[in-house]
Amino acid sequence: MAMHFIFSDTAVLLFDFWSVHSPAGMALSVLVLLLLAVLYEGIKVGKAKLLNQVLVNLPTSISQQTIAETDGDSAGSDSFPVGRTHHRWYLCHFGQSLIHVIQVVIGYFIMLAVMSYNTWIFLGVVLGSAVGYYLAYPLLSTA
């Protein structure tokens, strides 16, 4: 295995069954990794947007609700009960954790593909990352 970047139409990417031996196979592999890089950027933006949405929708302070309930002042309050708020928070946290795991796995797949030191693969990942950033980041500013 070469330890420097090379232009080649042959490579073994990630698994033995993903063995490329032709220019068409390399083009298809570059396209797959380009789309994975776009997906990675989309997941990154989606995770940030989801976290922002969760933080906006949760009560300002769960500890203030806990104090109010122990004082008996929350009977007339229209806020969420503490148990329900905690349950929502844990569900959102679990969802965020799953999204994070998916993002990490895709990121490591992309990194390992680049470590094949094939210049075409590297350029496909860089282009996919740029396209993903271009397409996904304007979504952060929309409500």
UniProtKB/Swiss-Prot annotation:
Pfam families attached to this UniProt entry: Ctr
Any one annotated GO CC term: late endosome membrane
Topology of this chain in the membrane: Multi-pass membrane protein
GO biological process: copper ion import; copper ion transport; intracellular copper ion homeostasis; regulation of copper ion transmembrane transport
Cytoplasmic side stretches: 44-93, 141-143
Keyword Transmembrane: yes
Residues where Phosphoserine is found: 77
InterPro entries cross-referenced by the UniProt entry: Cop_transporter
Subcellular location, principal: membrane
Membrane spanning stretches: 23-43, 94-114, 120-140
Keyword annotations of the record: Copper, Copper transport, Cytoplasmic vesicle, Endosome, Ion transport, Lysosome, Membrane, Phosphoprotein, Transmembrane, Transmembrane helix, Transport, Ubl conjugation
Post-translational changes noted in the entry: Ubiquitinated; ubiquitination and the subsequent proteasomal degradation are prevent by SLC31A1 that stabilizes it.
Tissues in which the UniProt entry reports expression: Ubiquitous with high expression in placenta and heart.
Domain remark from Swiss-Prot or TrEMBL: The N-terminal domain may be involved in Cu(2+) acquisition from potential degradation products of proteins in the lysosome.
Subunit and partners: Oligomer. Interacts with SLC31A1; this interaction stabilizes SLC31A2 and protects it from ubiquitination and the subsequent degradation.
Name of protein: Protein SLC31A2
Encoding gene (name): SLC31A2
